[in-house]
């Protein structure tokens, strides 16, 4: 069978036949296509085939600026001398010619082809449905001839696979390009550029946009562009940014994920608690859980609240120490205290002034006011009350100079003897008796070994180190984990972790009596981070979510006892691990990363 075939000819989408137009003859068509091809292959950069050597560039740059300076100088002289501008000398004429030549060269150097692409884009880059239909018709003519009676197969479906642009390799020392996220589109892109350029302050995005999540997304992209560092691993979705506005965090760009584990059940005062612990330290939750198991098997622990009062200590100054002492006697007078309490209590329906403790340093007086704060941690509440008292005392002592509403005699977020001795927040003691059988089977150690280790480590060792409130094994580990999980202030872990752990053999040396005394646990169940969804869920797990309307302050006090009970469990387990020599092995198993941490940041 004589089947004629013809080779496929290149087709250019810029040539499409109209409905009433006849196809060109073969030789004319080939000629037309060759002309179209030549037209398409013309590069805009060929318009100015000027050499671009370094010496030539330097010559034309120098000529351009020199001639411009000369012509501007002559122009100023003509204006000053009232000489017509069209009257030019031979040197000025040469300067004008040199200027034109340098401008032409510089246009070619900086890419005249870039400008021409906008002119020729409509002809060379256009692609519509007519072009595609024309190509399909041309391809369909490459099959068997229909006049020979051959069945014409359906043209195969043309699938155009998108070609991914080649990814440039980036050296470890190169600065990566800022990531372009979904926030970088449309109006958001303009806002991002304005923030990067300093036209819009980053802190004002929430108020300007009215959308906290959108503001966080834009701020995150801005940080990536400014620093050149990727924030891909910092999550943005799945968080209510309106809930932290004006309360928890300013200028957010995302949130950090911390795993939460459960230790328990902790049998405390006859009730069982499942304790949430947010931590990245392996073995911590497992160790605390073992301590809870030992306490549960021995009948549970007992916790007693000793004191409950938040403090704030302003600093005031007088002209003489005598005047400072007079104010000290005034505020410590029981009769005057009633008046001060009435003024203080006006700040809140939960705030109740309990006592005032004063200290003098020369002519400076520090007044440590202590008050109950209900279910709130109470720093804002007590500060408002202190301000009311200062305003009242200012009328009684006009020469009193208020240095600051906080004089560090409080003492907040710092290890201080005044907190260790007088207490701050909730002062709690928690105890349990662990039977000999549990010590051996669950804790894998001996009672005598635990008592000796506690004396030499937690008591003598801490004294040798000059510890202040640190007569324990790792109370801050448990306090921090529970604080983060329940929305407390992590910085107040400093004084809240003040703890002395005591161990003693009882019942003829067979059983172990263990106790922890913590004088300054600062917690609350309302306000701050407690209203966030995750932290609120953890508080709900403990049964202390929100304020207790029937007995104000009872939820916060119960949370403090749970913290102390958890510390008791953690102390018991860690001391047992050290006593039996299990500490290193357990940490090598549960607290050692296997990932490669040598990779450079991107």
Swiss-Prot record:
Question: What is the name listed in the Swiss-Prot or TrEMBL entry for this protein?
Answer: 3-hydroxy-3-methylglutaryl-coenzyme A reductase 2
One GO term (biological process): sterol biosynthetic process
Where does the UniProt entry say this protein principally localizes? endoplasmic reticulum
| Location of region: Linker | 116-187
Keyword Glycoprotein found: yes
As recorded in Swiss-Prot or TrEMBL, the protein's gene is named HMG2
What EC numbers are recorded for this enzyme? 1.1.1.34
Glycan-linked positions: 124, 345, 458, 591
Topological category with respect to the lipid bilayer:
Multi-pass membrane protein
Q: Which cellular component terms (GO) are annotated to the entry?
A: endoplasmic reticulum membrane; peroxisomal membrane
Q: Which Gene3D superfamilies match?
A: 3-hydroxy-3-methylglutaryl-coenzyme A Reductase, Chain A, domain 2, HMGR, N-terminal domain, Hydroxymethylglutaryl-CoA reductase, class I/II, NAD/NADP-binding domain
Q: Which family does it belong to?
A: Belongs to the HMG-CoA reductase family.
Reaction catalysed by this enzyme: (R)-mevalonate + 2 NADP(+) + CoA = (3S)-3-hydroxy-3-methylglutaryl-CoA + 2 NADPH + 2 H(+)
Which pathway does it serve?
Metabolic intermediate biosynthesis; (R)-mevalonate biosynthesis; (R)-mevalonate from acetyl-CoA: step 3/3
Q: Where in the cell is it found?
A: Endoplasmic reticulum membrane
